[in-house]
């Protein structure tokens, strides 16, 4: 079967992992491809489009807002930048120079992964909590809520939390710590 990738000399693979960017993401449903094809025929104001997308994402997820990005790394970079700068365009224009801004992001050591490069590229200081290996035996464990709380100070902009199948502590506990810190 001849396809666009074979014409470029790229060998197709079988992706049994799911929507992983490094494996091409997910195969789009025909309705999605049709909508993209239709959208490509028009020019629109991107701010207005993002506003409409935000409303749709919020309505369907129950979140306060939403933002469409090109992938997970872009989403992490933009959300970290938003936590550091707020709505201040002067601060936005200074990035990755975060001097004088709330520029610390707290993260469990066991949550470290290649996506934290996107977070660090904003110019933040990554503050690690917990012990990285929770499977080795006595005295070795994952982060505890109190460790997140102890790491938060006046320069903390965010907590970077990665949800895995067995992530500890649970997200609700970390959110409670963040809200208690203000």
PLM segments and residue spans:
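Conserved PLP-enzyme active-site core in the AAT-like
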Residues: 2-23, 27, 54-68, 73-182
